[in-house]
């Protein structure tokens, strides 16, 4: 019996050492590819043309639960709906101005477009947050502010691209806010293992070895390496203006998409959900969204002909489609 226990102890210790060795090895001895300024993977020409004629409000601050200031842009209207619309990876709220101006100008909704922590011109720690889940907390704090300011309005939370994923994560988990009525997902990122993922988009350089290693360490409560970069973004040089965010830490990247059981996060979204995807999206597999959302009876999927990844945010037709859904 003693011999058996001794052998079991040795095997257990050896397995633990091997597990830690693999976790630390994958985390520390792999690197994230440097972002390229030459790639043109997701039709940035639309973004260039859009920003030439933008009317963009100044950033305003709000205080989050950790006492720090985060920022948003505010588009006022007389509507009884408020949309909180969150930007995608790599940039910030500025590129959402055309959609926000349309919704507010047409009297469809008042719009708030936050710069997520780690993003935008005012961030103190670009590409990083303090811990996994802090993005959800910040969004909840903004939602509470909006509810206080607009107590009789419907609240819709929306996100484009990676922040569509962040919205799913928040809505499908324990941090969902009870005041939210509906969700708007514009070409949302789901998960690297979801059928919507496209391997050849050339937009992101994800270090899967590091992601796996850090995931292994996090599963046993080791989080002190979560500040390490896990992904970078190939944003063309001519659209960079020193307010972009070209790399994410592991803890920020994890916070920007649904959990590994992404089907469960989607299923648990118990409000009305509208998913808009362009048939010509260069980043995701547009024809797979129906399958990914099939277990949520509240979800409506709309595929726009001739629309690209940015097109679902920037095209006037997309603005009208979104407005029509909001007015239902």
PLM regions and their residue ranges:
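Conserved alpha/beta-hydrolase "acid-adjacent" motif
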Residues: 282-288
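Conserved alpha/beta-hydrolase
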Residues: 100-124
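The serine-hydrolase catalytic nucleophile loop
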Residues: 89-101, 287
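Catalytic nucleophile-loop/oxyanion-hole region of alpha/beta-hydrolase
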Residues: 90-93, 120-154
């Amino acid at each position: 019996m003693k011999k058996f226990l001794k052998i079991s102890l040795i095997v257990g210790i050896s397995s633990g050492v091997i597990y830690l060795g693999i976790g630390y090895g994958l985390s520390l001895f792999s690197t994230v590819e440097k972002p390229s300024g030459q790639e043109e993977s997701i039709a940035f020409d639309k973004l260039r043309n859009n920003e030439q004629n933008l009317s963009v409000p100044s950033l305003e601050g709000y205080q989050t639960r950790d006492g720090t200031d985060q920022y948003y842009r505010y588009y006022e209207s007389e509507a009884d709906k408020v949309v909180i619309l969150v930007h995608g990876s790599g940039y910030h709220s500025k590129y959402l101005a055309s959609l926000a101006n349309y919704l507010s100008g047409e009297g469809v909704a008042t719009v708030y477009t936050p710069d997520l922590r780690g993003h935008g011109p005012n961030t103190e720690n670009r590409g990083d947050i303090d811990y996994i889940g802090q993005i959800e907390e910040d969004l909840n704090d903004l939602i509470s502010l909006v509810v206080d300011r607009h107590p009789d309005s419907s609240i819709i939370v929306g996100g484009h691209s990676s922040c569509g994923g962040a919205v799913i994560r928040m809505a499908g988990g324990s941090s969902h806010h009870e005041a939210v009525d509906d969700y708007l997902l514009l070409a949302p990122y789901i998960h690297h293992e979801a059928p919507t993922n496209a391997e050849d988009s050339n937009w992101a350089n994800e270090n899967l070895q590091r992601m796996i290693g850090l995931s292994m360490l996090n599963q046993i409560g080791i989080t002190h390496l979560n500040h390490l970069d896990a992904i970078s973004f190939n944003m063309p040089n001519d659209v960079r203006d020193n307010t972009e965010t070209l790399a994410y830490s592991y803890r920020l990247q994890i916070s920007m998409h649904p959990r590994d059981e992404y089907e469960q996060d989607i299923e648990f979204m118990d409000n009305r959900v509208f998913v808009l995807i362009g048939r010509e999206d260069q980043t995701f597999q547009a024809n797979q969204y129906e399958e990914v959302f099939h277990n949520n009876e509240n979800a409506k999927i709309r595929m726009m002909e001739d629309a690209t990844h940015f097109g679902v945010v920037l095209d006037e037709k997309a603005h009208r489609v979104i407005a029509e859904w909001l007015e239902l």
